[in-house]
Amino acid sequence: ESLTRDHMHVYGYKRETTPFQTEANIDPHYTFFNHVYSCYTQTVQVLTCALTEKNQYNGMNLSDAYSIIDLAREAGFKTTWISNQSRFGIWDTPIGAIGSECDDQYWLNQYVGTDVITKDYDTALIPYLRKVDPANRRQLIVIHLMGSHISYWDRYPGEFYHWPVDTSKERETAEVMNDEYDNSVLFNDYVMESIMNEATNYLHADAVMYFSDHGEEVTARPGHNADQFNFTMVHIPFWIYMSEDYHRINPKTAAMIEARRNVPFSNDMLYDTLMGIMGLTAVHYDSACNLFSPDFDKDVTTLMTMYGNVMIRNDREQVGENKEEIDRLWNRKRME
């Protein structure tokens, strides 16, 4: 939630905000993707695409779109939804409707209203993974974090107050916001480490996919308002963990996942991409929107964000004139 890769050390940010993910980046079980964008700057608009057939490229109405939960259940998967976000808040109800399709649901946040509020840190979600039966190998588990959503200082416990290092200096508002956001990113990294410990040691997950809904502009007046759009609001992390078993059983898909680490992509196509990873390619699936399919037909000239109103090729710092140099630096860093 609200995590821009521009504040993640694993993606080149100056502060070490992601010690776990920085280490995971050199683990061959993980693949980090370098040029991934959100399709919008707000949660509902993003996740109603990322988790359903609807995307920027097919023009489908949400009311006509199947969700990944629909198709997983039809294919015999046990589905579980674990969330620290509100189920019925004004900003959350469409996502709550998707989560409510799951066989098992754990909604920690009972708040109903117009604010984004929770009484729990995201680590409160971790014990609910122990309610999942690891013996059932045909499962889809969705975890929805509160992440780095405003107010940043409410997203992490005191022991993760790492910045500023020198608390005696007076700070401008922009510096305070930057420090608080980075502390939330550091805590989020710890949450991901905790989730992955459960996923690998208890659930023995075949694969884990992690992405942010959208990014954040961190200034004196931070946020992700579409009316003040800039690209840092849609710069998001995306990575996949694959177990040894997944590599062995799905060698072609695993090889394609690793080969596509530097291919630009937008997260409204995660539905088709996840369908491909799960082997659900019979119906309600478009291989042209699956990043790991040979049929994937999007590139930097056609990729969009903001529901088709902004072309990703205009983000020249990331994928324009400097794309090849960025890729070289990224690959060199991985080998260090």
Annotate the PLM regions.
Residues N55-G59, G113-V116, E175-D189, M196-N197, ...:
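Active-site rim elements
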Residues S2, A75, I195-M196, D206-H214:
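Conserved beta-strand->loop/alpha-helix structural units within folded catalytic cores of enzymes
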Residues T31-N55, A207, E216-N230, P237, ...:
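Membrane-proximal envelope and lipid/glycan-remodeling enzymes
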Residues I126-K131, D166-V208, I240-M242, R261, ...:
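A long, amphipathic alpha-helix that forms part
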Residues D70, R87, N197-Y202, A226-F229, ...:
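Membrane-interface soluble catalytic domains
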Residues G12-T17, T200, H204-A205, M209-P251, ...:
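Histidine-centered active-site microenvironments of extracellular/periplasmic hydrolases
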Residues S2-S168, N267, D272-D297:
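Active-site-proximal alpha/beta segments of enzymes that process anionic O-linked groups
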Residues G158-V176, Y246-A255:
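Flexible internal linker/loop segments at domain or repeat junctions
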